[in-house]
Amino acid sequence: HLLSRRQRQMCIRDRFMMTLDDAVDLVVYAFEHGRNGDLFVQKAPAATLVTLATALKELYGKDTPVKIIGTRHGEKLYETLVTREEMARAEDMDNYYRIPCDSRDLNYDKFFVEGSEVVSQIEDYHSHNTHRLDVEEMKQLLLKLDIVREDLNLN
């Protein structure tokens, strides 16, 4: 079982949530809509692992204690998928961002003369400003995974 009877506790952090099917959809979408050098980012929901742990406990009917272990040395507090510099040139394609290849030259004098203040007014796309899954949404996402469905004998 994913939550074994002997497991004493779950340790948690924050992360984006993406199923294998979502990853395949992203690759197919990029092939169909991309140009050479483009970067595609799915607008994936995020969740704290407290939400994940709670959803797993509810699905499995277990009362496994959860221990919040905090940030490890060198670990970021959130995950950035698109920087504000990339967001300044990104194309919003509904469920994805398309970031075209940055083909500017390295003429820095041009930047200082023609620089843009727009970048300083744009926010990164990261795990703290995307949709956060609640426990019910997380359970629905988990139930899309064959490993969970098989483990719960739902297939």
What residue spans do the PLM features occupy?
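Single conserved hydrophobic/aromatic residue that forms the stacking wall/gate
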Residues: 1-12
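Short acidic (Asp/Glu) and glycine-rich catalytic loops that position anionic groups and cofactors
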Residues: 6, 32-36, 117-121
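Hydrophobic alpha-helical scaffolding
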Residues: 13-17, 42, 128-131
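Amphipathic, alpha-helical segments enriched in basic
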Residues: 24-27, 31, 113, 117
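Mid/C-terminal beta-alpha module of Rossmann-like enzyme folds, strongest
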Residues: 33-98, 105, 140-144, 149-154
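Glycine-rich phosphate/pyrophosphate-binding loop
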Residues: 92-145
